[in-house]
Amino acid sequence: MANSMNGRNPGGRGGNPRKGRILGIIDAIQDAVGPPKQAAADRRTVEKTWKLMDKVVRLCQNPKLQLKNSPPYILDILPDTYQHLRLILSKYDDNQKLAQLSENEYFKIYIDSLMKKSKRAIRLFKEGKERMYEEQSQDRRNLTKLSLIFSHMLAEIKAIFPNGQFQGDNFRITKADAAEFWRKFFGDKTIVPWKVFRQCLHEVHQISSGLEAMALKSTIDLTCNDYISVFEFDIFTRLFQPWGSILRNWNFLAVTHPGYMAFLTYDEVKARLQKYSTKPGSYIFRLSCTRLGQWAIGYVTGDGNILQTIPHNKPLFQALIDGSREGFYLYPDGRSYNPDLTGLCEPTPHDHIKVTQEQYELYCEMGSTFQLCKICAENDKDVKIEPCGHLMCTSCLTAWQESDGQGCPFCRCEIKGTEPIIVDPFDPRDEGSRCCSIIDPFGMPMLDLDDDDDREESLMMNRLANVRKCTDRQNSPVTSPGSSPLAQRRKPQPDPLQIPHLSLPPVPPRLDLIQKGIVRSPCGSPTGSPKSSPCMVRKQDKPLPAPPPPLRDPPPPPPERPPPIPPDNRLSRHIHHVESVPSRDPPMPLEAWCPRDVFGTNQLVGCRLLGEGSPKPGITASSNVNGRHSRVGSDPVLMRKHRRHDLPLEGAKVFSNGHLGSEEYDVPPRLSPPPPVTTLLPSIKCTGPLANSLSEKTRDPVEEDDDEYKIPSSHPVSLNSQPSHCHNVKPPVRSCDNGHCMLNGTHGPSSEKKSNIPDLSIYLKGDVFDSASDPVPLPPARPPTRDNPKHGSSLNRTPSDYDLLIPPLGEDAFDALPPSLPPPPPPARHSLIEHSKPPGSSSRPSSGQDLFLLPSDPFVDLASGQVPLPPARRLPGENVKTNRTSQDYDQLPSCSDGSQAPARPPKPRPRRTAPEIHHRKPHGPEAALENVDAKIAKLMGEGYAFEEVKRALEIAQNNVEVARSILREFAFPPPVSPRLNL
C-alpha cells in the first residue's frame, strides 16, 4: 500500500521523506476540505499548459536520461496529449462553443491537473539535478510515476472526449451494477470530488477507516487530482470486480496481497523479478498501463525467464487461483506465503437473457437456436462481452483472444469486460400457438406471419415442429453478448419481409457455423475448423450449383457451375456431413423454412405441404440432410449478400424446377400458410413449391459457402443419384435468399433457374438425399408479389444480428433495398461469380457465392470460400437473413433423400441461356423494350396460368424464350408428391 500511496505524488519534491509526510498531511486536509474551484480553461490557459508540456518534453529528451522507448514513454505521451487537446479545441473553435468548453467542469479540472503535473515534472528536474540521470534514483522513479500519471490522463481525455467531442455525460460504465451506482448518486456527472465520492461509496460499501479511505483513493485516483471521474471509476470496478464485493476484493488484492505493485511499469516489473529468477513461480501484478482496466501479471518461469501476461475474461483473483493451481503463481514478490484467494470465489449471479418469441422463431426457421454460439455452432453462448453486448461461448472468445484477436470478434469493439450469462430458452407453450415463425436475433419478426390467418394456420405445425427442434438444439441455457457493432446490430426494415440485420463481422464465418445454420460470427480465432458443422463443410465443398439436366435425375455439373468447387465434391461433403453428423437442432419443417411472407399464397401452401403433407421424415430429412439446413439459412453472410443484391422475390419466382425468382428467394414467403406440399405442388404445378424447395436447397449450399465467409453458395452438391425435383421444389425461394439460390446460378431468366434447380436437385440428391434418405417436402413457390428486392434484403440478417441481444437499430440501406428491383436480382449475385464463370457456371453461381461476390461482398472468395475480414460491420442492409432463409430451405431439401422422393419434377433443359441470364440484369434493355402484356398473353395462349407466366417472365427478365423454357421446365407440377409423402 505504501507504493500506491506514494504514487499519488510522484514529484515528491526530490527524495526528502519529510516533504513527503508534509504532502501527505496536505492531502488529508484536501480530502476534508475538498479541492478548490477551478478557473475557466480558456484557450489562453490551454496554450500555457502546452508550453509547460513542451518544456517537460525538452527536459526528457536529454540524452543523459537514456529513456527507454517502452510504456509509459513520456516522449510519446505528452505529444499525443497535445494533439488530442488541439483536436478538442478544433471542435470548439467558435467563441460560443469555446466558452462552453472552457466552462466544462471536467475540462477545467483536467487542464488544471495537467498544468500542475507538468510543473511538478519541471520542478523534479530542477531539484533532482544529476540524480535524474541515475536510473535507480528516487528522483528518476518519481519521473516514471509521473509518466504513468500522464499516461492515465491521456487515456482519460480520449475516453471522455472521443474524436474531440465531449461524451462524459454519456460514458458507459462497463459493469451494470457499478453503472447503476454512479447513475443513482451522480446522475450524468463526469467527475466528482473525492470527498463526495467517498461518502456515496460508503453508503453502499462501508469504508472502515480514514486510512483505508486514503489507500482506496490512491488506487482509484489514477490521475492523482483529488477527483474521481467516471472513467477512473469504470477502471476501478473492472479491476476489482465484482461490484458486490468490490472493497473486499480490493482489500485482498491491493491492500494485503504482497504481490500487488502500484504505479509499476513493464520494465520495473522485470527488474523487480530479476532477483527471483532462480525461484520459479515468483510473481507480482500491476495495473496494465497500456490496457487500463486490466491486470498485468509478471512471473518467473521454470527456466528462469520473466514473462508478463494479461489475463482475459476472468477476475484477477480467479486468474491468480488458476495460476497457482497450475504452478505459475506461487510466490508473490518472491515470498513463500501465497494468500488463499478462494474465499473471493463466490458464485456470481449470471445474467439471464430471455429469448423472445421472434428470436425463437427466427432461429427455429434457421434450424438453430438462439443460445447456440454463432462462431463454433457447437457450444451454447455463456459469456457476454462488455460493453458491446455480443454473446458467444467462452471457448470461442478464448480462442479468439489467444490468436491475438483484437476487440469483440463481431464488432471489434474494445472488450472492457465479460459477464457470464444464461439464456432462458423461449417456451412456445407460454406463447400459445405461435411457436416459431421466424426467429429474429434482435427480437424482430423476420416475416409478418400474423397478417394472414391462413398463413398462421399453415405455419402452425411448422412452428410446433420448430419448437421441438429448437428445444433439442438448445444445448445450454447460456447465451453470449449480443452485438452489431455494432454498429453490428441489425436494423429493422420497414417491410415486414425485411429483417433488421447486423453488418457482417470482419472475421469470416466458420463453416461449422454455416453447418449449424447459425449466423456466423466474425471471430477469427474462435472460428474453428468446420468439422463441427457438417453443413458448413458442405458449403465449402459445394461449388455453385450446376444446372442438372432433369430435376429428377441428378444432372452432371454443367460448365456454368463455378469451377472453384466441384458440385460433386460439395455434394459429397454435404452428404457426408448430413449422414455422419445429425443436425444440431432438430430439422425444421419445410414450412418453417419457407417464410410465408416471402412465398406466394400457393407457395406457402407448398411449404405447408412440405411440412404437413409430406411425412415428417421428409421434413426432417430436409433439415437433417443439411444436418443444419436451417442453420445454413441462418447464415448471415448469405443473407447479406442477398440483401445487397436486393433481388425481388417475385422476380425469383419458384418454378417446378425448384428455382425461384431472385426476389422470392430473397424473401421467405409470408403468404397464407403453405398447404400440404402435394396439394400445393399440383396447384402450383410444382412451380412455386419446387422453386421454394430449390431455393431452400440452394440456401443450404449457400450456407455451406458461408463457411467461407458466411457466403451463401448455391453450389448444389451435385447429387446425381438423387432426384433434383424435390429439392428444386422445396427451397427455391430460399435459394433466392442466398442470392445464388434465388436463381441458383441463373440469376437471370428462367433457363438459368432451371439449371440452378437441377443443380439444387443434384445437391439435394447427392447431399441431402444421401445424408437423409427421406424425401424432402417441397416448399411452396413464392408469388411474384414478393419480387421486391427489399423483401429479400429484409430477410437477410448478419451473424452479428443474431448474436446481439440488442434490438434492431434501424433499417439498413441494404435492408431497404428498393423492392422495385427486377425479380432476377440474382444476376447481382451472379455478377460476382458469373462474370468470371463460363455462361453455364455464371447462370449457376456457387449459389450464394456469386451473390456474396457481389460488390457488396467483394471480400468473399468464391473459390476458397474464405473471406477477408471485413470491417466489424459490413453492410447493415445485406440480405443476410434472406440468404439464410434460402440456405435453410436449400438444406431442408438436401436433408430429404432424393431416393425416397418417388417422383421428381421434369428434368430442366440445359441452361444454355443461364449464363446470359446471370450476366444479364433483371432490368436489361431487352425486357424494357418488349411489351410485357403481349408476352404474357402469348405465353398464356400456350396454356400456362397467368401467375406462372408472370413469374417466369420476371425471372427471365421478360425474355419470352427463357420464360417459355422455364414454364416448360417448371410450370407443370413435378412428380414430387411421393417424396413429400415420405
Swiss-Prot record:
Pathway(s) it belongs to: Protein modification; protein ubiquitination
Location (main, coarse): cytoplasm
Annotated phenotype, changing residue 937 to E: Loss of ubiquitin binding. Reduced levels of tyrosine phosphorylation
Entry's Gene Ontology cellular component terms: cytosol; glutamatergic synapse; membrane raft; nucleoplasm; plasma membrane; postsynapse
Modified residues (Phosphotyrosine): 363, 665, 709, 889
Effect on the protein of changing residue 911 to A: Reduced interaction with CD2AP and with SH3KBP1. Strongly reduced interaction with CD2AP. Strongly reduced interaction with SH3KBP1
Region spans: SH2-like: 241-343
Enzyme class: transferase
UBA domain boundaries: 931-970
Effect of residue 257 to L: In ADMIO3; likely pathogenic
Cross-referenced Pfam families: Cbl_N, Cbl_N2, Cbl_N3, zf-C3HC4
Keyword Nuclease: no
Biased composition (Pro residues): 544-567, 819-828
Tissue: Expressed in placenta, heart, lung, kidney, spleen, ovary and testis, as well as fetal brain and liver and hematopoietic cell lines, but not in adult brain, liver, pancreas, salivary gland, or skeletal muscle. Present in lymphocytes (at protein level).
EC number: 2.3.2.27
Any one of the GO BP annotations: positive regulation of protein ubiquitination
Result of changing residue 904 to A: No effect on interaction with CD2AP. Reduced interaction with SH3KBP1. Strongly reduced interaction with SH3KBP1
Listed Low complexity bias regions: 838-848
Region ranges (4H): 35-167
Assembly with partners or alone: Interacts with SH3 domain-containing proteins LCK, CRK and SORBS1. Interacts with LCP2 and ZAP70. Interacts with CBL. Interacts with SH3 domain-containing proteins VAV1, FYN, FGR, PLCG1, GRB2, CRKL, PIK3R1 and SH3KBP1/CIN85. Identified in heterotrimeric complexes with SH3KBP1/CIN85, CD2AP and ARHGEF7, where one CBLB peptide binds two copies of the other protein. Interacts with poly-ubiquitinated proteins. Dimerization is required for the binding of poly-ubiquitin, but not for the binding of mono-ubiquitin. Interacts with EGFR (phosphorylated). Interacts with IFT20.
Protein name from the UniProt record: E3 ubiquitin-protein ligase CBL-B
Gene: CBLB
